[in-house]
Regions:
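Flexible helix-coil linker/loop segments in the cytosolic histidine kinase module
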Residues: 1-13, 71
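Helix-loop-beta hinge of the Bergerat
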Residues: 16-52, 120-123
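Short beta-strand/loop element within the Bergerat-fold HATPase_c
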Residues: 75-85
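Acidic ATP/Mg2+-coordinating residue in the GHKL
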Residues: 93
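Glycine-rich nucleotide-binding loop
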Residues: 86, 97, 134-140
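A short, flexible helix-to-loop-to-beta junction within the catalytic ATP-binding CA
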Residues: 7, 31, 67-75, 126
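ATP phosphate-binding glycine-rich loop and adjacent ATP-lid/helix-beta elements
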Residues: 103-134
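Conserved ATP-binding N-box helix of the HATPase_c
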Residues: 53-75
Length: 146
């Protein structure tokens, strides 16, 4: 598992689209409570750097981990699309939501480390992240691919 987390084999073997689909299938198999819905809308012939792909997979994994731990939701929707040379990730759950700003920026709390790392990872990729509370948590992440 540790080696897989560091470098998922499906990235090299199957490409970006299938790596995302395999990861979401893995989430579905491992959960007895959450139902996953996904939409991956791009051509798998894309030539995207494997390190960028791994970073995107880690972002989705972190969002999933947080949703499982904290949302108390029963559904997660993951949409990944390519638009204007950007990978767009929408990650939505139907859980209780939270105050994103205070969780990420309040250093007096002993929480939000995963989200802080997520924010920093997205920034290092020259991307941006937007959070909306809408009957659960809804993240929109945009990352340039070239």
């Amino acid at each position: 598992n540790i080696i897989y987390e560091l470098r998922p084999m499906s990235v090299d073997d199957f490409g970006f689209k299938n790596a995302i689909m395999n990861m979401i299938d893995k989430f579905n198999r491992e959960s007895n409570v959450i139902t996953y819905y996904s939409s991956i809308n791009f051509d798998d012939e894309l030539s995207i750097d494997s390190n960028l792909i791994i970073s995107i997979l880690r972002i989705i994994n972190e969002l999933n981990s947080n949703a499982i731990k904290y949302s108390n939701g029963t559904e997660i929707i993951v949409n990944v699309t390519l638009k204007d040379n950007n990978v767009i990730i929408e990650f939505k759950d139907n859980g209780k939501g939270f105050d994103y700003y205070n969780t990420v920026y309040d250093r007096n709390k002993n929480s939000g480390f995963g989200l802080t790392m997520l924010k920093e990872r997205v920034a290092l990729l020259n991307g941006n992240i937007k959070y909306i509370y809408d009957n659960g948590s809804d993240f929109f992440i945009e990352i340039p691919v070239w």
